[in-house]
Amino acid sequence: MLVLGIETSCDETGVALYDTCQGLLGHTLYSQVDMHREYGGVVPELASRDHIRRILPLIRQLFRQSDTSLESVDAIACTQGPGLAGALLTGASFSSALAFARNIPVLNIHHLEGHLLSPLLSDPAPDFPFVALLVSGGHTQLMRVDGIGQYRLLGETVDDAAGEAFDKTAKLLDLDYPGGKLLAELATQGRAEQFRLPRPMLNSNDLNFSFSGLKTAAALLIGKHEMNSQTRADIAFAFEDAVTDVLVKKSVTALNITGLQQLVVAGGVGANSRLRQKLLHHLSGTDITVFFPALEFCTDNGAMIALAGALRLQQLDERLRAGGSFTVKARWNLEDL
């Protein structure tokens, strides 16, 4: 069965084709980063309008590159939420209309489920069950994943998400948009011994996170020093070091509590090289295996949505619906699946 995946939850338009026998046939992605840069962040109305412009040309490009056609598609999987309501409506309405015209079903996919399952696009892939660290601009969660749709929250941020803290601290350092990625690049030039920032909730008796206070501590540190290129790099290093220390410690604790021996790291911050290095170093010599998505699948993309749709299609998922009607969920708890 061939599934067309469509992702429009924020500022990337992603489409992909996933075959239940052959795997991923192809995917195309358009990022709106350049458009939003002058505003210093995502403008929801502009994001929605750009999805409308991009989605059909991207699908045509996808079919050409994959040497297939719409007539071969058995179902469409689209992101139903969470995300920006207008952006979600663009993908959902397009998916529903296309499915109605072709008389094929639509699967509503949770955006975070797509991220959780994205390492399954790579080889080797994890087996169920596993612990997942889902870390992005909007979410920081530890989940126990026992199967498709079987997700249990172990811990989450009580305030800012890790990616959000990266972006906000990047603004304090006068970095351009997207700030989190630029902060990580700047941190590679920083010196480890110059500054140390707190590790919030590092030793708490739960698996929750907090990054708001760390951002405030970084702001106070920036205010105390005259900024030059080296000082900015040193502070970036200290900030990234603190965030990744917390993420690693909590992930290892989750593995110890659950007794599971597989860790999946997913979401945009999962591309962070220092986080990857620390996890691999900390877990080397143990029986625990860490799985990272390919870098192209860390950001929002259609491939993870097509994959999630294909897996649910194989299970004859109850959310399978006919084209012609649709709803979106700007807020949606992953445990409610």
UniProtKB/Swiss-Prot annotation:
Taxonomically, the superkingdom here is Bacteria
Annotated Fe cation binding lies at H111, H115, D300
GO CC annotations, alphabetized: cytoplasm
On cofactor binding, the record's note says: Binds 1 Fe(2+) ion per subunit.
What UniProt keywords apply to this chain's record, in alphabetical order?
A: Acyltransferase, Cytoplasm, Iron, Metal-binding, Transferase, tRNA processing
Q: What is the uppermost EC class here?
A: transferase
Write out the annotated subcellular location.
Cytoplasm
Record-linked SUPFAM superfamilies: Actin-like ATPase domain
Under which EC number(s) is this enzyme classified? 2.3.1.234
InterPro entries assigned? ATPase_NBD, Gcp-like_dom, KAE1/TsaD, TsaD
Task: Report residues binding substrate.
Answer: L134, V135, S136, G137, G138, D167, G180, N272
**Gene Ontology BP term (one):** tRNA threonylcarbamoyladenosine modification
Which GO MF term does the entry hold, naming one? iron ion binding
Question: Which Pfam family, just one, is annotated for this protein?
Answer: TsaD
Main role?
Required for the formation of a threonylcarbamoyl group on adenosine at position 37 (t(6)A37) in tRNAs that read codons beginning with adenine. Is involved in the transfer of the threonylcarbamoyl moiety of threonylcarbamoyl-AMP (TC-AMP) to the N6 group of A37, together with TsaE and TsaB. TsaD likely plays a direct catalytic role in this reaction.
State the similarity comment.
Belongs to the KAE1 / TsaD family.
PANTHER family per the record?
A: TRNA N6-ADENOSINE THREONYLCARBAMOYLTRANSFERASE, TRNA N6-ADENOSINE THREONYLCARBAMOYLTRANSFERASE, MITOCHONDRIAL
Quote the protein name from its UniProt record.
Answer: tRNA N6-adenosine threonylcarbamoyltransferase
Q: Could you read off the lineage of the organism from its UniProt record?
A: Bacteria, Pseudomonadati, Pseudomonadota, Betaproteobacteria, Nitrosomonadales
